[in-house]
From Swiss-Prot:
Transcription factor that promotes cell proliferation, differentiation and morphogenesis, especially during embryogenesis. Coiled coil: none annotated. One of its GO terms (molecular function) is DNA binding. PROSITE patterns: AP2_ERF (PS51032). One of its GO terms (cellular component) is nucleus. Keywords: Developmental protein, DNA-binding, Nucleus, Repeat, Transcription, Transcription regulation. The keyword Transcription applies. This is AP2-like ethylene-responsive transcription factor BBM2. InterPro entries: AP2/ERF_dom, AP2/ERF_dom_sf, DNA-bd_dom_sf. Residues 210-276, 312-370 bind DNA. Its main location: nucleus. SUPFAM superfamilies: DNA-binding domain.
């Protein structure tokens, strides 16, 4: 049996009751079938009538079988208005189920003909006083429909659930759509549904990574490393603990390595890492001397997730205007940041931070450089914070003695005792002549160094040859002291204030050139000049007077200084006169 067979039983239920309900002849009946209205030509006696009522439901059921498609979804047909409205009866109630299930003719649908529909839109009685709907309008409508729809309905595949909604409103939809447009629209909807791409696997997990502890930010595209610290997890807490941020990275591998290092610090070598444990042997040794928080802070500083102007050193930032480096230390001075100053290089700013960290946090402070670089004892004992120029002076005071200047260990406060002077060995260029000219008119006052005049105020030292057996004179207010070339010692030595220096038979000797720091203010700066003495001096008298002749000082390549470690080779450099 065909599934499209739909009908309503003829029941004489309250036949006489409905006889008195007669529809107005001026009413145009219509049914909304697939968006198109069909009008009753027999009821169109007055074409100017603007009142529209809904056609009875059986007609809509018949046409619904022709307009349904196998691929389309079920539609809810809206039967607007009531089946029959009594205009003159004020006591007429709203539409009832009996109006739709009243007396009618059985409807049977075939592919050849369509049965007649007995009765009009209003059930006026058995003799049908309202007129009948002609088949010409239905055939015209069926002629416009695709044949496939009718065939599909014949096969019984188009039977869908029917939903009738009763609405007391008398207004109808003014937008008229053709059935062809609806069919085309239905196909377009089906095609669009099929054309919609399904979400692929790649679209899921935009912030995930193939590495453990690494996520990719969906906005910036950078990789972030996080670690869940379950050591602070409270009892009864369902979460993993506290999330520790390890920094942002441009490369996924760098973020994965940062997670590995943090995991090794938190959970030891038994934890699971992204890369082999053998690649972190050096880092494992370094992290042993740091706490978890300190090591996490170091990982963050090494990341590329810092804001603009940040430095690789701890506590150092770059000023956005003048470009100089600023140093700050936090959690001091009332749990606030302490400004340490502005520096030309980030290394100097890092040193200032280290000094402040040592001052406030002692030996457990985390510094940018090795703590052995600083005089920790002096920093801790200092009443103030040695930052900037004060730190530089402290650094220079603690700097080891340069190798070119060998300072004697015996320091004497007496001006006549030269044991506290610095004995410097100076090597001069080969072939340079050193001339000492003595003025006959003014004894022991002027000297000439390669034609340059040294005033008597600069150096009051008197030199005399060994043949004259005169001692060199010294002024107690002068820098230079008596230098005697005595015959009691070997010809390869020179006596400086009673101390014999220059053993070994070399070509040149060193004389004290700088005084002690405590007595430096008492002497003129120009007296700190270097003087050389030849191993063998010969006196040559000029015809014009008793002037020492020019002597050539060919200094050897090896020179020793006299001190506790006598015999050690002193470094060489070139000395020039400051005048």
């Amino acid at each position: 049996m065909n599934n499209n067979w739909l009908g309503f039983s003829l029941s004489p239920y309250e036949q006489n009751h409905h006889r008195k309900d007669v529809c107005s002849s001026t009413t145009t009946t219509a049914v909304d079938v697939a968006g198109e209205y069909c009008y009753d030509p027999t009821a169109a006696s007055d074409e100017s009538s603007a009142i529209q009522t809904s056609f009875p439901s059986p007609f809509g059921v018949v046409l619904d079988a022709f307009t349904r498609d196998n691929n389309s979804h079920s539609r809810d047909w809206d039967i607007n208005g009531s089946a029959c409205n009594n205009i003159h009866n004020d006591e007429q109630d709203g539409p009832k189920l009996e109006n739709f299930l009243g007396r009618t003719t059985t409807i049977y649908n075939t592919n050849e003909n369509v049965g007649d529909i007995d009765g009009s839109g209003c059930y006026g009685g058995g003799d049908g006083g309202g007129g009948s709907l002609g088949l010409s309008m239905i055939k015209t409508w069926l002629r416009n429909q695709p044949v496939d729809n009718v065939d599909n309905q014949e096969n019984g595949n188009g039977a869908k659930g029917l939903s009738l909604s009763m609405n007391s409103s008398t207004s109808c939809d003014n937008n008229n759509y053709s059935s062809n447009n609806l069919v085309a629209q239905g196909k377009t909807i089906d095609d669009s549904v099929e054309a919609t791409p399904k979400k692929t696997i790649e679209s899921f997990g935009q912030r995930t990574s193939i590495y453990r502890g690494v996520t990719r930010h969906r906005w910036t595209g950078r990789y972030e490393a996080h670690l869940w610290d379950n050591s602070c997890k409270r009892e009864g807490q369902t979460r993993k603990g506290r999330q520790v941020y390890l920094g942002g990275y441009d490369k996924e591998e760098k973020a994965a390595r940062a997670y590995d290092l943090a995991a090794l610090k938190y959970w030891g070598t038994t934890t699971t890492t992204n890369f082999p444990m053998s690649e972190y042997e050096k880092e494992i040794e370094e992290m042993k001397h740091m706490t978890r928080q300190e090591y996490v802070a170091s990982l963050r500083r090494k990341s590329s997730g810092f804001s603009r102007g940040a430095s690789i050193y701890r506590g150092v930032t770059r000023h956005h205007q003048h470009g100089r480096w600023q140093a700050r230390i936090g959690r001091v001075a009332g749990n606030k940041d302490l400004y340490l100053g502005t520096f030309g290089t980030q290394e100097e700013a890092a040193e200032a931070y280290d000094i402040a960290a040592i001052k406030f946090r002692g030996l457990t402070a985390v510094t940018n450089f090795d703590m052995n670089r600083y005089n920790v004892k002096a920093i801790l004992e200092s009443p103030s914070l040695p930052i900037g120029s004060a730190a530089k002076r402290l650094k220079e005071a603690n700097r080891p003695v340069p190798s070119m200047m060998m300072i004697s260990n015996n320091v004497s406060e007496s001006e006549n005792n030269a044991s506290g002077w610095q004995n410097a060995a100076v090597q001069h260029h080969q072939g340079v002549d050193l001339s000492l000219l003595q003025q006959h008119q003014e004894r022991y006052n002027g000297y000439y160094y390669n034609g340059g005049n040294l005033s008597s105020e600069s150096a009051r030292a008197c030199f005399k040859q060994e043949d004259d057996q005169h001692h060199f004179l010294s002024n107690t207010q002068s820098l230079m002291t008596n230098i005697d070339h005595q015959s009691s010692v070997s010809d390869d030595s020179v006596t400086v204030c009673g101390n014999v220096v220059g053993y070994g038979g070399y070509q040149g000797f060193a004389a004290p050139v700088n005084c002690d720091a405590y007595a430096a203010s008492e002497f003129d700066y120009n007296a700190r000049n270097h003087y050389y003495f030849a191993q063998q001096q010969q006196t040559q008298h000029s015809p014009g007077g008793d002037f020492p002749a020019a002597m050539t000082n060919n200094v050897g390549s090896n020179m020793y200084y006299h001190g506790e470690g006598g015999g050690e080779v002193a470094p060489t450099f070139t000395v020039w006169n400051d005048n």
